[in-house]
């Protein structure tokens, strides 16, 4: 079966490097499924749960919380460059829950003070926290 290499890179370094037969990512235009031999592509990514089906076993799926970034597909190498990314096994759920509560509180306070920029920043923080919670709970 054809395969591709999937690498996820953040400012902290290489977070993921494995062979896969399928990945699913989310772009601003919707979900994008990628198989081996996909045509070359560069696209922006949303905050999302990335699904990676590994080649070793049909039931072996890795989940990664990706916080935006870009995807490049070229010659069966899929590279994700993101601000941050965490595998399900590396997510501290209690920390993610605390981040969610902080973001919810920040949204309420910013709304009361009519600070639109702060509301938007807190909403992004909330999306990231919820993404980490969803992936960490898998």
Curated annotation (Swiss-Prot):
It holds the Pfam family ATP-synt_DE. It comes from the Bacteria. Keywords: ATP synthesis, Cell membrane, CF(1), Hydrogen ion transport, Ion transport, Membrane, Transport. It is a peripheral membrane protein. CDD domains: F1-ATPase_delta (cd12152). GO terms for molecular function: ATP binding; proton-transporting ATP synthase activity, rotational mechanism. SUPFAM superfamilies: Epsilon subunit of F1F0-ATP synthase C-terminal domain, Epsilon subunit of F1F0-ATP synthase N-terminal domain. It is found in: Cell membrane. Belongs to the ATPase epsilon chain family. Produces ATP from ADP in the presence of a proton gradient across the membrane. F-type ATPases have 2 components, CF(1) - the catalytic core - and CF(0) - the membrane proton channel. CF(1) has five subunits: alpha(3), beta(3), gamma(1), delta(1), epsilon(1). CF(0) has three main subunits: a, b and c. This is ATP synthase epsilon chain. It comes from Streptococcus mutans serotype c (strain ATCC 700610 / UA159).
């Amino acid at each position: 079966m054809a395969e591709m290499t999937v690498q996820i890179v953040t400012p902290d370094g290489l977070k993921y490097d494995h062979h896969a037969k399928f990945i699913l990512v989310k772009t601003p235009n919707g979900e994008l499924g990628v198989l081996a031999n996909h045509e070359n592509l560069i696209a922006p990514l949303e905050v999302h749960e990335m699904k990676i089906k590994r080649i070793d076993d049909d039931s072996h799926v890795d989940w990664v919380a990706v916080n935006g970034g870009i995807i490049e597909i070229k010659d069966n190498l899929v590279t994700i460059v993101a601000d941050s990314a965490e595998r399900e096994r590396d997510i501290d759920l209690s920390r993610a829950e605390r981040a969610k509560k902080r973001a919810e509180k920040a949204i309420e306070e910013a709304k009361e003070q009519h600070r639109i920029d702060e509301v938007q920043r807190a909403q992004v923080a909330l999306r990231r926290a919820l993404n980490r919670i969803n992936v960490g709970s898998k």
